Every structure is written in structure tokens, then in C-alpha cells.
Amino acid sequence: MKRIKVLELQKNRGKFEIITNKIAEYKGVCGVWIMYDNHEQLLEVAQTADVFKELAYDLSWLLKEYSCDGDLRKRYTARRLFEFNQKFDVLSCDKNRTTAKYRTIAQNAESILVYLIVEDRATSRDKTVREKVEMEIAIDNKALYWNAFGTQRKLAKDYYKNKYELK
């Protein structure tokens, strides 16, 4: 899979420092991005209509300081679609499931690498094409924190069943 690095974070004294940040070059650009940790484990995959906008939002949550004075009571445990998905808790201090995911990633990873997939299907203007690419990458590489959204859930279950269970 052809890819280019757009973001790299390295933990120093418990906080992420930005090593590489090229996301501004992708304002208004649609695509599919992938996120790895220091163990080369795929953490997340997402398609987006604006790479910069989405990764800037995600980056803000990865760089946030999560202090003990926040409300750390557990609200619920995020649902998993597949066994390979990582369990994580959504706490009272979390804005939503997404922010809880990035809080968990920030606590557990020592470094993060984000790549933009630069293949025709991944850069398609057609959202359904990008969603299919996202789903295939996430399932085939067992992305720990990936979560199918809406109608993508059924497509993901069918894809997994046809590719891995019917053999």
C-alpha cells in the first residue's frame, strides 16, 4: 500500500512532542489515513473529506493533558465490533467516544505515526469508495481502535465473515 507520512509524535517525559506535522498540506483533501504505534500495531484507520480538519482535531486530543483533577468516573465501556478491537472506557471527563479513544491511545503509546494512503481508491471523491478502503485496511490489519459507523457495521461484518470465516 503506497503511503506518505503526514504526522509523527514521540513521547518525551510522558507528553507527546511533534516530530513531523505535514497535515496542513492536506486542507480540503479527501483521503484515507492510518495510524500506527511504536510497536507497528495499527491503531486506527479513517476516511475523511478533509484530511487536515480531521487530523487536526485528533491531534488536539492526542496532545491534551489528562490530569487527575478531571472527572475520571467510568461512564461506559466502548463496544467492540470484532475480537481484535481494543476495549477502552469512556470516562465522565471525555467529550465522547472519539476523545476517549485518543485519551487511551495517548496513555498507552510511546510514539505515533500517521500516514496518508496515496492510491486511487483511497483518494476518491466518492465517500463510499473511501469507506470500503478504510474498512478493508482496518479489518485486514486488525486496527485496535477502529469502529465501523452506521451502515458500515453490517458491511464490515459481512466482509469479515466472507474473507475470514467462510474458509
Place the predicted regions along the sequence by residue:
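Boundary/linker segments flanking structured domains
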Residues: 1-43, 48-167
